[in-house]
C-alpha cells in the first residue's frame, strides 16, 4: 500500500518500523513492510514544530517524569512534572536517540485527538494508541503493558531497536490506499 506511493525507499522490507507523517497527524507501525497499527498523533505547534528526523526507539519508559528542555525553562518558565495525572507524557513514553529532545509518548489530554488540526505540542509526538504501540514494540500483550504501567516508574528495553522516521509528506495514502 505505502510502496505504491513512492514511500518505499524509507521502509525496510524486514522487521519493525515506525513512520510518522507530520502534516497528516498520523503514525503507522509497520512489520515486514506491512501496516499493523495506525494512530492519530499530535505534533508540534507552528512555533515549536516537529522536525523531520530519523531515529530509533530503544526503550519504553513507564510512568515517566516530564522534564522541560532548557529552552522551555528559559522561555516559558516550565518546571519538571512528576508521574501522575498532570503529566503531559501520560503513562508511557518511547525513548529515542536524537539531539532534539523529540520522542513519541502517551498524553494526559486524550480529548485533543478529537480535533482535526492537531499541531498542539512543543514538538514531541503524542500517540493516541500509545498502549497498543508499546505492546507491539515490546512483543507484549495489552495486559502485560497494563501490568508494567502498574509497577510504577521504570524503563523496559526493546528486544530490538525500532527505526523511526518523522517525515513531511503532503500527499499520503489513507487506510484505503
Predicted regions and their residues:
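N-terminal pre-domains immediately preceding structured catalytic cores
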Residues: 1-177
Amino acid at each position: 500500500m505505502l510502496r505504491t506511493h513512492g514511500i518505499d525507499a524509507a521502509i525496510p522490507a524486514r522487521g519493525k518500523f515506525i513512520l510518522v507523517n507530520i502534516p497528516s497527524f498520523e503514525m503507522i507501525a509497520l512489520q515486514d513492510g506491512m501496516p499493523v497499527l495506525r494512530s492519530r498523533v499530535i505534533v508540534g505547534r507552528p512555533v515549536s514544530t516537529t522536525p523531520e528526523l530519523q531515529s530509533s526507539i530503544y526503550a519504553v519508559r513507564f510512568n515517566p517524569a516530564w522534564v522541560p528542555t532548557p529552552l522551555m525553562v528559559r522561555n516559558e518558565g516550565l518546571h519538571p512534572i512528576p508521574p501522575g495525572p498532570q503529566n503531559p507524557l501520560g503513562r508511557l513514553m518511547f525513548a529515542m536517540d536524537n539531539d532534539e529532545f523529540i520522542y513519541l509518548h502517551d498524553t494526559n489530554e486524550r480529548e485533543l485527538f478529537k480535533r482535526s488540526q492537531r499541531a498542539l505540542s512543543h514538538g514531541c509526538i503524542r500517540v493516541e494508541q500509545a498502549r497498543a504501540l508499546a505492546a507491539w514494540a515490546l512483543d507484549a500483550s495489552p495486559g502485560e503493558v497494563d501490568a508494567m504501567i502498574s509497577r510504577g516508574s521504570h524503563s523496559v528495553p526493546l528486544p530490538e531497536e525500532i527505526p523511526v522516521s518523522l517525515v513531511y509528506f503532503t500527499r499520503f495514502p489513507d487506510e484505503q490506499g
